[in-house]
Amino acid sequence: RQRQMCIRDRYLCDGHEVVMGTKISCAHPEGHGLLTVSQALEESCNDALMQMAATIGKDVFYDYVSRFNFGAKTGVDLPGEEYGLIIKKDLVTDIDLATNSFGQNLNVTMVQEVAAFSSLINGGSYYQPHLVKEIKSAGGETLLENESVLVRKTVSEETSQTLRGYLKNVVDYGT
């Protein structure tokens, strides 16, 4: 049942989805109506996000979880970095996928979130995060310099550009 999403796709929010016999509600109980992907993000529409996750399916959804490094250490230059907590793909039910689509059940660190989001909007390049670019002595000598390390590509430049537009709309028109 999985397929790719298209920017022309529309999603009908009637206020909820029923998944495995369980009603999962949108914050807008009377529904948002027919929404584009951009409008669904602007409205933070859980119903549309659940439909999007169902469209791409569990395998593709979890491929993106992995691409964005959720559930893995980022390599940030801080002691005690945590992995976060992600349900293993083979244990995920349709209900889990539905609620994961709007961020529930995904326990990620702030560093993971920032690194992932940065790659989403910077053209799709996931870089190892650092807190400090360089350290210089009082005399101006460079004592430490952290180079940018490209870890992987997460999305295409075209997808990144599209999402930048959608996210601008979230700021301009969203909830």
Specify the residue positions occupied by each region the protein language model found.
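Beta-lactam-recognizing serine transpeptidase/beta-lactamase-like catalytic domain environment
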Residues: 4, 8-175
